[in-house]
């Protein structure tokens, strides 16, 4: 397969980019009004038309008033072919599409040939080069890119991830009419992060009204040929879905081949194409929505503008590559790998920060129409919507940083899943897994068999090996901005930016609907949802035409216009939250003993009665094994939850963002069927915090069930980051069935744990512990390790010198554990100590006087939530909420109280403690004869070998380097000691010889029988004897320095030394016995 380097002439770009700039991306022309007439491809001169002429299709005429930075009208498909750039700032290596196709003598698709004639007739005024390349300094796999953020006009950063080629293009343009473009990305077997600099070219992701799906994949020749065939049928909307399927399958096979050939992808093609609106699906809507067909067309226009706003607001895209599989550009059912507008990438942290799963899986007709199409600037644009027979042909914008493959769709039964959207803001980096490496999202092909047969099988799992449908409101940068700019039918204003209070975005979660669901709001503010899994027809329309991003919409059965029919409006400040909900299958109910009636609703903002609610900053942490609730009183139609989940959602904590109270008016719509609403929301905080119940609000107009919001506030007594299970939140019950919200304010109900055990008498406690240990003969080491998770020395010091409670900070936890241990029954204390070290994690709550939380609900059933740890050792569930039920009417739904028992375990310290358990002593190392002789020979040559030499010696002899180093160190010490011993012995022998001479001389003087000559001879003989006795010892001084004399007990030198010692025994003993000076020497 030819790479793009073979297709593209590297030397033509720098000139043609400036000369034919209007052919590529024309941003400097004045607003144009294209006619609706469709033009057929003409001659070869059309190849040099402008970019609008090259890749576009006739669009519906629409009046647009450009304000702010300007935009372009029409539904244009932009093709950006990105390849290795040169080393210069202005040099690149690609041509425009028609020239490439001309050089290769290949026919152009209709999408490149067809365009209104008026674009060519209208003169274009390009004052400057419309394309500005950000400085390219960083060489990345043949591509040079630099994020020049210092420039004032370059307001965005560039993000390069994992060896991907990318091109940062910024349009320098004057006023434009609205340009609405959808960007699809084809990447080959590479995870990529591409920041597309979109400043004035606001409309990058949009639906084209009446414009069919066009895509030109310039990855290789095969795809171009495929595109030709695809372009022929692209203008027949009714034939298009089947053509898309065929084209998608061919393209997948081609990309799989290309992934094998190209490795990390020599080519990166950014295909910007617009999708059709699937009007025929709109007609199949079973909602009885008479306005559906008419509004769908307008909705696509407004949705396109809303996405244009979203993109222009964030102006940051990230390319998606999923498991060497690339979704075809025209394949609307699995529009998967696309560009996602997000905030600038933050520095990569140790943990993947935030990850919002989003997708739209619809088993039936789903018509979500937005009449006025005011897309409030959100960071994520209706991510990953996969429609089966849906009228939502809205574009998918998704990111997945792992190897993910969109599942194969067979005909109209599309079982593909929605992409994973990662809203990334500063301080948040969305990665597939916690560690941030390539996450093989558990294979998406499995999802086809799991979701397709019944469209209600909605399978989502959490990355922490648990079953969960996770939603991250990535609110620090996904702040829902509600601009009140009601758009007229053709106008598009950019004045929503001031309305974005924090300029952030607001993420949305899932919509699971089974049956017909038409959701209309009172205020008509539509929260655009991502996970829309509908088994039947679902039409979401607004009355007031303001589109929003709403959280989990789960409905089952007929759901008429929820104007005031009990829809709980979730208003939330854009803080970090996790909204988790999923129907509970029967097996999970049996496992967790959850009543099939109303479940707990935790951390749900109040109903619409008060729209100025704030949620405390909460870090989203995917719970371990959490319970969701059944959405019906019966278990019929429950979404099945299996253990082998295909979708992995990674949720990790991030530091809390700054809060802005002015965003509090933002509403998040959480809907369900009017009479059947049981939801289970868990909200967990990264930091240890007590749970505060606050602002409980009844339902609205007919569903008086209560919703209690639980805040998390200041830290309380925690064990290793876990909140103690005795800390229970006292929840203010809400009793009023009226529309008003009964709020108790921020009622900070602290927990008994921290308050009861304040001011512990540490001295008395230490004495009692010492007495107990002596009474039962409990070793301090066992007690310290198994109960306190401390060492024996620490316990001994604490018992001997306990500090006053007021002077303790982190050390209070140890005394708390002592105190709890004393409060336990005697048999429990002893059993805790007898447990094996391997059972310490299960024993820790018992020894701490805790038990895993189980609270009985109104039906008497208990719900338990086991806790777990993330791979980084941080707490997974650190919340201990207890919600109270409020029965305001017979129809009200009781809220089951759930106690999450926090495990106060010393798991972090256990592992080192277990490793520090006494181990059997290592056997004494004995050198073999070869090793010993080799080491001694080397020591004779060099007393201090270098580290490298020691390593070499150890490798040659099969020893450890430390062993070799110890040998040489010991050899030096022993040689010095031997030298000193031998030197002292020789000195003593010389002195003793002189003493013998003196004595003999005295004896000779007294003996007159001996002559003078005999005395002289005797002295001479004595001197000769002395010299003979000194010679071997002078030799010993040198041999003592050698390893033979130093180490070897078996060597010959040692035998010689022993013979010398034997020779010196009698004189030494004689000298010691006779001469007192001998002892001194």
UniProtKB/Swiss-Prot annotation:
CDD domains reported for this sequence: homeodomain
Residue spans of biased composition, Low complexity class: 851-867
Localisation: Nucleus
Residue spans binding DNA: 751-837, 918-977
Comp. bias intervals (Basic and acidic residues): 485-499, 658-686, 995-1006, 1057-1073
InterPro entries: CUT_dom, CUT_Homeobox, HD, Homeodomain-like_sf, Lambda_DNA-bd_dom_sf
Tissue note: Neural-specific.
SMART domains named in the record: CUT, HOX
Keyword flag Transcription: yes
Compositionally skewed regions (Acidic residues) per UniProt: 278-301, 1047-1056
SUPFAM superfamilies linked to this entry: Homeodomain-like, lambda repressor-like DNA-binding domains
Biological process annotations from GO: positive regulation of transcription by RNA polymerase II; regulation of transcription by RNA polymerase II
Biased composition (Polar residues): 311-326, 1007-1041
GO molecular function terms attached to this record: DNA-binding transcription activator activity, RNA polymerase II-specific; DNA-binding transcription factor activity, RNA polymerase II-specific; RNA polymerase II cis-regulatory region sequence-specific DNA binding
Keyword Transmembrane helix: no
Cellular component per GO, a single term: nucleus
Region annotation (Disordered) ranges: 274-326, 481-504, 653-688, 844-875, 978-1081
Domain of life: Eukaryota
Keywords attached to this entry: DNA-binding, Homeobox, Nucleus, Transcription, Transcription regulation
Family: Belongs to the CUT homeobox family.
Function: Transcriptional regulator. Binds and recognize ATTG sites.
Name of the featured protein: Homeobox protein onecut
């Amino acid at each position: 397969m030819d790479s793009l380097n073979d297709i593209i002439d590297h030397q033509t770009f720098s000139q043609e980019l400036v000369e034919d700039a209007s052919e590529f991306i024309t941003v400097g022309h004045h607003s144009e009004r294209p006619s609706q007439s469709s033009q057929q491809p003409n001659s070869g001169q059309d190849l040099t038309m402008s970019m609008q002429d090259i890749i576009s299709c006739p669009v519906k005429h629409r009046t647009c008033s450009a304000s702010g930075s300007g935009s372009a009208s029409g539904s244009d498909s932009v093709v950006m072919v990105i390849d290795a750039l040169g080393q210069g700032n202005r040099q690149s290596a690609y041509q425009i599409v028609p020239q490439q196709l001309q050089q290769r003598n290949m026919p152009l698709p209709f999408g490149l040939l067809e365009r209104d004639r008026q674009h060519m007739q209208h003169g274009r005024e390009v004052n400057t080069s419309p394309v500005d390349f950000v400085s390219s300094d960083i060489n990345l796999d043949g591509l040079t890119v630099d994020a020049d953020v210092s420039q004032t006009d370059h307001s965005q950063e560039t993000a390069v991830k994992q060896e991907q080629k990318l091109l940062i293009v910024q349009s320098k343009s004057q006023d434009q009419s609205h340009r609405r473009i959808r960007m699809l990305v084809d990447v080959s077997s590479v995870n990529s992060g591409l920041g597309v600099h979109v400043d004035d070219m606001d409309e990058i992701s949009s639906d084209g009204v009446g414009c069919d799906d066009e895509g030109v994949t310039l990855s290789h020749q095969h795809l171009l040929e495929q595109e030709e065939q695809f372009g022929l049928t692209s203008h027949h909307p009714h034939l298009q879905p089947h053509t898309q399927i065929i084209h998608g399958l061919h393209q997948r096979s081609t990309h799989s081949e290309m992934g094998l050939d190209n490795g990390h992808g020599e080519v990166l093609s950014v295909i910007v194409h617009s999708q059709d609106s699937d009007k025929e699906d709109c007609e199949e809507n079973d909602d009885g929505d008479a306005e559906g067909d008419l509004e769908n067309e307008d909705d696509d226009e407004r949705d396109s503008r809303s996405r244009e706003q979203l993109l222009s607001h964030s102006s940051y895209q990230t390319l998606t590559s999923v498991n060497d599989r690339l979704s075809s550009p025209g394949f609307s059912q699995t529009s998967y790998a696309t560009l996602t507008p997000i905030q600038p990438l933050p520095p990569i942290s140790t943990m993947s920060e935030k990850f919002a799963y989003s997708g739209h899986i619809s088993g039936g007709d789903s018509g979500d129409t937005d009449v006025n199409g005011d897309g409030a600037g959100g960071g994520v644009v209706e991510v990953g919507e996969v429609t089966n027979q849906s009228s939502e042909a809205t574009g998918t914008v998704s990111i997945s940083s792992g190897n993910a493959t969109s599942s194969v769709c067979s005909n109209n039964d599309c079982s593909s899943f929605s992409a994973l959207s990662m809203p990334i803001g500063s301080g948040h980096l969305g990665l597939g897994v916690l560690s941030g490496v390539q996450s093989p999202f558990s294979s998406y092909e499995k999802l086809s068999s799991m979701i397709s047969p019944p469209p209600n099988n909605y399978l989502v799992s959490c990355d922490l090996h648990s079953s969960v449908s996770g939603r991250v409101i990535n609110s620090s940068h996904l702040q829902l901005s509600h601009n009140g700019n009601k758009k007229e039918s053709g106008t598009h204003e950019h004045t929503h930016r001031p309305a974005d209070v924090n300029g952030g975005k607001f993420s949305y979660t899932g919509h699971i609907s089974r049956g017909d669901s038409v959701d209309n709001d009172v205020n008509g503010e539509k929260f655009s949802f991502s996970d829309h899994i509908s088994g039947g027809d679902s039409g979401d329309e607004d009355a007031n035409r303001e589109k929003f991003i709403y959280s989990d919409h789960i409905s089952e059965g007929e759901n008429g216009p929820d104007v005031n029919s009990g829809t709980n409006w979730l208003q939330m400040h854009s803080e970090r939250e996790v909204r988790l909900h999923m129907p509970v299958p029967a097996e999970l109910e049996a496992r967790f003993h959850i009543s099939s009636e109303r479940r707990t609703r935790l951390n749900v903002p109040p109903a619409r009665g008060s729209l100025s609610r704030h949620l405390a900053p909460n870090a989203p942490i995917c719970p371990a094994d959490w319970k969701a609730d059944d959405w019906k009183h019966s278990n019929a139609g429950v979404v099945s939850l299996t253990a082998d989940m295909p979708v992995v959602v990674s949720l990790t904590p991030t530091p809390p963002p700054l809060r802005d109270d002015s965003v509090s008016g933002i509403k998040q719509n959480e809907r369900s069927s009017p009479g059947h609403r049981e939801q289970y929301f868990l909200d967990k905080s990264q930091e240890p915090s007590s749970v505060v119940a606050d602002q409980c609000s009844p339902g609205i107009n007919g569903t008086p069930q209560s919703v209690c919001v639980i805040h998390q506030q200041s830290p309380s007594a925690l064990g290793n980051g876990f909140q103690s299970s005795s800390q229970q939140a006292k929840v203010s019950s809400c009793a009023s069935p009226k529309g008003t919200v009964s709020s108790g304010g921020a009622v900070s109900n602290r927990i008994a744990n921290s308050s009861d055990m304040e001011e512990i008498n540490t001295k008395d406690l230490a004495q009692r512990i010492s007495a107990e240990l002596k009474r039962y003969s409990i070793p301090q080491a066992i007690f310290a390790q198994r109960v306190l998770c401390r060492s024996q020395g620490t316990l001994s010091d604490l018992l001997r010198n306990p500090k006053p409670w007021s002077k303790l900070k982190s050390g209070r936890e140890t005394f708390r554990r002592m105190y709890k241990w004393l409060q336990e029954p005697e048999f429990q204390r002893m059993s805790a100590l007898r447990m094996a070290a391997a059972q310490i994690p299960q024993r820790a709550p018992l020894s701490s006087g805790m038990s895993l939380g189980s609270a009985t609900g109104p039906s008497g059933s208990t719900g338990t939530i086991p806790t777990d740890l993330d791979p980084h050792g941080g707490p997974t569930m650190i919340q201990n909420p207890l919600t109270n039920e409020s029965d305001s009417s017979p129809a009200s739904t009781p809220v089951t109280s759930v106690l999450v028992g926090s495990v106060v375990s010393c798991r972090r310290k256990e592992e080192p403690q277990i490793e520090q358990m006494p181990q059997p002593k290592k056997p004494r190392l004995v050198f073999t004869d070869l090793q010993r002789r080799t080491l001694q020979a080397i020591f004779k040559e060099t007393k201090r070998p270098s580290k490298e030499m020691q390593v070499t010696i150890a490798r040659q002899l099969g020893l450890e380097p430390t062993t070799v180093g110890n040998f040489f160190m010991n050899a030096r010490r022993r040689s010095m000691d031997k030298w000193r011993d031998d030197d002292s012995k020789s000195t003593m022998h010389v002195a003793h010889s002189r003493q013998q001479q003196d004595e003999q001389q005295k004896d000779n003087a007294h003996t007159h029988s001996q002559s003078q000559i005999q005395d002289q001879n005797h002295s001479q003989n004595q001197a000769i004897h002395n010299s003979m006795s000194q010679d071997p010892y002078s030799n010993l001084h040198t041999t003592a320095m050698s390893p033979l004399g130093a180490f070897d007990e078996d060597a010959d030198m040692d035998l010689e030394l022993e013979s010398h010692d034997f020779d010196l025994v009698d004189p030494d003993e004689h000298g010691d016995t006779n001469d007192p000076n001998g002892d001194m020497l």
